[in-house]
């Protein structure tokens, strides 16, 4: 279990992605994920250790999973809602996100909402990073009686993928 801590109060602790599907290649870039909270919302941070990430899509809601992409799937309140959010972002900062019951049943999110996440990407020689904030007010649009509690346990998954990259990986 991963304890979500208050932003800028504790040293960052990362979850590292270690499991990849066998795609017939050995491409398994190291990915670190961290999530913290503040009075504004949840702050997600990824370190992706790959050089020259493939990033063809530039607009929110494009199929960014085809690019070099990181994904966070999260139930913000599994007791009040059986739906989860999927946040998928590529190295251009383009995000695909919606509120899902499952793969086929989902509620769309507006471009204005995605713009409020303040997505920041930084690409360096052998690493790229992604930072964004999910405001509590955004969550309340979909989970009406959502109330953040400091010691909440969030069910979530973190992924790295690239369907159309030089070395397909999941």
Put a short name on every predicted segment:
Residues 1-170:
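Structural preference for beta-rich elements and adjacent junctions enriched in aromatics
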């Amino acid at each position: 279990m991963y304890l979500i801590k208050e932003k800028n109060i504790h040293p960052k602790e990362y979850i590292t992605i270690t499991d990849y599907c066998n795609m017939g290649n050995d491409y398994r870039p190291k990915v670190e994920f961290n999530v913290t909270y503040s009075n504004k919302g949840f702050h997600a941070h990824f370190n992706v250790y790959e050089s020259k990430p493939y990033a063809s899509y530039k607009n929110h809601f494009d199929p960014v999973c085809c690019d070099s992409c990181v994904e966070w799937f999260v139930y913000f309140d599994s007791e009040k809602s059986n739906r989860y959010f999927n946040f998928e972002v590529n190295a251009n900062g383009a995000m695909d996100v919606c509120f899902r019951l499952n793969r086929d049943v989902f509620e769309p999110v507006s471009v204005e909402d995605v713009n409020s996440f303040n997505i920041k990407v930084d690409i360096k020689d052998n690493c790229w990073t992604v930072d964004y904030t999910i405001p509590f007010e955004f969550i309340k649009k979909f989970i009406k009686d959502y109330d953040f509690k400091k010691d909440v346990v969030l069910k979530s998954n973190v992924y790295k993928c690239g369907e159309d990259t030089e070395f397909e990986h999941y």
